[in-house]
Amino acid sequence: MDLQTQLQELKTSTQAKLAEMRGEHSKELQELRVAVLGKKGSLTELLKGLKDLPSEERPTVGKMVNEVRDVLTEAFDEAAKVVEAAKIQAQLDSESLDVTLPGRQVNLGNRHILSQIAEEIEDIFLGMGFQIVDGFEVETDYYNFERMNLPKDHPARDMQDTFYITEEILLRTHTSPVQARTLDKHDFSKGPLKMISPGRVFRRDTDDATHSHQFHQIEGLVVGKNISMGDLKGTLEMIIQKMFGAERQIRLRPSYFPFTEPSVEVDVSCFKCGGKGCNVCKKTGWIEILGAGMVHPQVLEMSGVDSEEYSGFAFGLGQERIAMLRYGINDIRSFYQGDVRFSEQFK
């Protein structure tokens, strides 16, 4: 039998065997591939016979060998796809799916209490016509201090021990720089400026039950014509009553902040004893909750705002402070320790 006839028979017989392959024949398919196309396979053995052919026949037979190899390689690849598909279908046919079985329970997280407090406060201010403005946590000394009426070497800078990155770059100690930047750009011909600037701030404090090197503030600013201390008091009363209950009262005590004049500390009537005096309010009936005041004329002037024509008020409150008072939390570190047992209380 000549070599060409043997090649044709090998191709025909192999194709016939491949046509019979089913899903359970994956092992047989691999064995057949090795037996036909492997290094010691039938096609390789036939190829060795080329050397015995006359020189004029070798090109023709060599071409036929390559064609048979290509045809069988493609046939094996197609057969492998058929076998794999049949195997998958057989597996699907043998399995049943009970759609009435309950699914796997997934433990879902919840919003952190500080995020809940921030969103609640933001919603209150949005309802009062304020805008929310975000700013940079890494700030310049100029905007963090000088624009807040705290020039270099001002003694009040000691009140805010600061993380400096360079002599002029720092981690902001309050969100007031956002107010200064917004004040620079505001067009008062379109109306007064009413904004809050929530965010994280940093102080070089030693962490303990009441202090943290990072915490969250929400500072507010209103600037327009004829803004008075009465406007400030009315705004703060509305905020406090929405946060702590309509029966809450506030009182203003004189204080000092470089960027407001006059400045006040704001107290709220104790929500545990109703102002009668208890351990929470240290028998005074009042709890200190935030600082505020009328915007210092110098702060307005540095933004190019005429302090003779415009006035304003500013205030700042801490999210941690609000949460601790509302929920009786006595350690600020609880907010940052990631204890699931703590977080689950505020779902």
Curated annotation (Swiss-Prot):
Protein's UniProt name: Phenylalanine--tRNA ligase alpha subunit
Enzyme class: ligase
Principal location listed in the UniProt entry: cytoplasm
Family: Belongs to the class-II aminoacyl-tRNA synthetase family. Phe-tRNA synthetase alpha subunit type 1 subfamily.
Cofactor section: Mg(2+)
Location(s) in or outside the cell: Cytoplasm
GO terms for cellular component: cytoplasm
GO biological process assignments: phenylalanyl-tRNA aminoacylation
InterPro entries: aa-tRNA-synth_II, aa-tRNA-synth_II/BPL/LPL, Phe-tRNA-synth_IIc_asu, Phe-tRNA_ligase_II_N, Phe_tRNA_ligase_alpha1_bac, Phenylalanyl-tRNA_Synthase, tRNA-bd_arm
